[in-house]
Amino acid sequence: MKQVSIRECKSYDYDVFRASFEKMIEDIGGIDKFVKEGSKVVIKPNLVIKKHPEEGATTHPVLVRVVCEELLKLNCEVMIAESPGGPYNKSNLKGFYKTCGLIDELSGLDVKFNYDTYEVQVHNDDAVYLKTMEVIKPIDDADFVINLCKLKTHKMAKYTGGVKNLYGVIPGLKKAEIHYRFQKEELFCENVLLDICDYVKPSLTIMDGVYAMEGEGPTAGDVRKVGVLIASESPHALDIAGCKLINLDPMKVGTVRGSIKWNLIKDDFSDIEFIGDNIDKFIVKDFKIPVTSSDFRLLSLKLPKVLGDIADKVITPKPVIDYKKCVKCGKCKVACPAKVIEIDEKGAKINLKKCIRCYCCHELCPKKAIHIKQNIFFKLIK
C-alpha cells in the first residue's frame, strides 16, 4: 500500500509550517526512512521561473529550509539543484536561487547551491523512450533525491506535481529538444516524463500545497489557498492526492495515465492510502482547471481519423501574444523547441502553422504576455 500523508498547513509562518511538517513526516515514518545518515542528498525544488515565492509559481523556500534542517540533523551533505527554465548557466542559476527566496531563507545553514552546469549522459534500460538522456550532474552524483514540488495547474500537462517536477533534472535547453522530439502530449506526459521519473527515483516527494496555482499555470495562473502539505515515497501516489485536492479527475492527467499504464499504481487507486488529516476537508471544488490539448485529443478520438486530424490542428488551443505586456525580452524565442518565434519591433511573433503547442513560451514568459486561446468551436462541441 502506497501511503500519502496530508496535513493541514495554514501559512508559511515558520513555526506553523514546521509543526505541520513534523506531523506529516512522522505519518510516513520520519525523514530517516528515506535517506541514510551521512549520505549525499540533492533537494530538487520547482524553480521553473524567476518569480518571488508569494507569486505561487515555485516551491516555497520555507519548505526547502525545513527539509534541509532535518537532513542536517542526520549529518547529510545537502545540495539544492535545479535546471530552471531557459539557459543552464551559473548566472541564471544564481538569479533563480535569489529571486525565488532560497539564498535568504537558507542563510546560515550548511547547505550548498549547485552552480556546476556540467551535463551527464545516463542510461536507463528500463525506460520505454528515453533510454539515454542528459541530466544535471548533481542528480547523477547523489545518493538520494528529495523531490519538492508545487501544486499547480499546467496549460500543457493540465496538472504539475510530483512526476512532472522531475523534468527539471534535464539541463537547460535540452528540455526544448525533448519537447520537439516528443511533440504529442500523450507521448510526452504518459511516457517520457515517466522515464525521467524512473531514472531519478526520488526517495521522498513532498508537495507544497499551502498556496497553489490555478488557471493558467504553471507560471501565469492565480494563487489559490489550499492549506495543505503532502508527502509520499511514491510521486505517482502523491499526484492522485494532488488531483483530488483541486477536484480534478486524475484520468485527465497524462502522467497519471502513464503511471497506470506502466503498473506503478492501480487504475482504481486501491493501492493508495491517504493518512493524516482527512483529504476531503481540503478539496477546492471550484479550482480553475485549464483546457488543454489532451481535452482535444479525447475529442478527436471520438471522430473519424480524417476529422480527428483536422480537429487536432484547428481547435487545439494556441498561444497568443498580448503586445501591451510584451517587452521583447526574447525568452520565449530561446525556449521555443520548434524555433518558430521571432522578435520584431512590435514584440514576439509566433508562426502558428509550425507551432507544436507545447506552450513553453507561455510557461517561461516573465510578464504573462502570452495567453493560451481556446477555440470557440470546442466550447460549442463540448
For each predicted feature, which ranges?
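N-terminal and secondary-structure boundary signal
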Residues: M1-V327, K333-A338, E342-G347, L352, ...
